[in-house]
Amino acid sequence: MIENNYYHMFANGADAKNFIISESDFIAAFNRIGVCAYSCNVTVVAASVEDTHPHVLLYGGFEQCKIFKSMYESMSLRYIGRRRDSSYAVKLKCELLKIEDDAYLKNVAAYTIVQATKDGKAIMPYDYLYGTGALYFRSPHTVLPW
């Protein structure tokens, strides 16, 4: 029987510069999260894509989450390689950390949802298009911007 746990997948933003350079890159990076989750049979609890790197809170078996990480990296690098010249090379090396306790789980969930809006962007987490904040904070009576 597979034991499911929570995992935090992320990349070091300093190493992954040029990960996103256009709106179509944001859209593709966010969509890859769903494709990988479906393909690997894991649940995405929270996610955000910043211009330098992704953050994803996953729930599933270790092997499935490890495959998710590898698939996301390889799909991202293929996407970037097909659309850019070598001057925009990207190093994308994701980490996968098992979440051991409730305090860390809450910290990762909050960080994942709000981090993309903390770097001087004049936007709230519920309005950030490339994260799951709107799914947590929007009123049921509010029409999502997308």
Positions of PLM-derived features:
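Short Pro-Cys-Gly-centered "Cys-loop" motif that presents a nucleophilic cysteine in a tight turn
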Residues: 1-52, 59-146
